[in-house]
């Protein structure tokens, strides 16, 4: 006789999960509602302190604060820590929107506001809603995820256009941009004008100049 396996009440558990999702939205709205104009900085969590990449992210955070922006990151180590450190040391708002992951370090020590999310989609919503621009430093899958989320929302007109700036001075993004232009555009997978959503800069000063000369939308989207 086959043993009966009790059914898992997936529907019930999913229904209760709604309250956790709502609570994360409410907490994010309440904590970030008074945030001044802000720029989100994304990059590698693996950049070691003292490395060239870490130093660039630190200078990015400092430059953005000096230009009048708060800095928002994923709140973790590496480039995120560096950008938050630069922002805080420059006397600015330094926000971390962390994600709960197994075996992940806690928030970095350079935050003036720290939030933690269980759900990636809630966290992404906060980045888009409360940032006037995305600055994309060299990074891995997580960095690419945030970048493609932004350009997809802009492409599909689910949000007003805002600057998405790829930063490198060593050709890190060249291969990706070549693939977008010579494969996606060439094969008709995206429109010829879509690559223009992405801007490029070599230095923090160039990023600030792009923000200064670009009509940046209000944070509420």
Segments predicted by a language model, with ranges:
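Short gly/pro/ser/thr-enriched loop/turn and capping motifs at secondary-structure boundaries
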Residues: 101-106, 143, 171-174
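PLP-dependent amino-acid enzyme catalytic core
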Residues: 7, 26, 32-35, 54, ...
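Solvent-exposed alpha-helices and their adjacent loops that cap or buttress functional pockets
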Residues: 32-34, 63-65, 88, 105-109, ...
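Short beta-strand segments
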Residues: 42-43, 74, 97-100, 137-138, ...
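C-terminal functional extensions of proteins
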Residues: 167-169, 174-221
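Acidic/glycine-enriched connector segments
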Residues: 55, 78-136
